[in-house]
């Protein structure tokens, strides 16, 4: 290993970056597939309610439905700003 390879690490090529991004998109699509049709509307309405009290970004509210042993679990994550 030369000193140059230590000081200047190899950059990721665009193919590997594109592959990682595609994997994220596919994982997100798989998680929303098969979910109830009302989830996007529920997420938007929850975001509007939270915005009445706290300024948050569009991506601050995450709604998921998980199915475990015959039960559906509604999971709600809201990322609030510090302060």
Swiss-Prot record:
InterPro entries assigned: MinE (IPR005527), MinE_sf (IPR036707)
Keyword set includes GTP-binding: no
GO biological process, alphabetically ordered: cell division; regulation of division septum assembly
Top-level division of the source organism's lineage: Bacteria
Keyword match Secreted: no
Alphabetical keyword list: Cell cycle, Cell division
A Pfam family reported for this protein in Swiss-Prot or TrEMBL: MinE
Database matches in NCBIfam families: minE, PRK00296.1
Function: Prevents the cell division inhibition by proteins MinC and MinD at internal division sites while permitting inhibition at polar sites. This ensures cell division at the proper site by restricting the formation of a division septum at the midpoint of the long axis of the cell.
Family that this chain belongs to: Belongs to the MinE family.
Name of this chain's protein: Cell division topological specificity factor
Species this chain originates from: Alcanivorax borkumensis (strain ATCC 700651 / DSM 11573 / NCIMB 13689 / SK2)
């Amino acid at each position: 290993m030369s000193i140059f390879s230590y000081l200047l690490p190899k950059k990721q090529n665009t193919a590997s970056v594109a592959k990682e991004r595609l994997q994220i998109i596919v994982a997100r699509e798989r998680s929303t597939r098969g979910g109830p049709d009302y989830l996007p509307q529920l997420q938007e309405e929850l975001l509007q309610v939270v915005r009445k009290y706290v300024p948050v970004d569009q991506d601050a509210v995450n709604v998921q439905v998980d199915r475990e042993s015959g039960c559906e679990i509604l999971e709600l994550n809201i990322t609030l700003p510090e302060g």
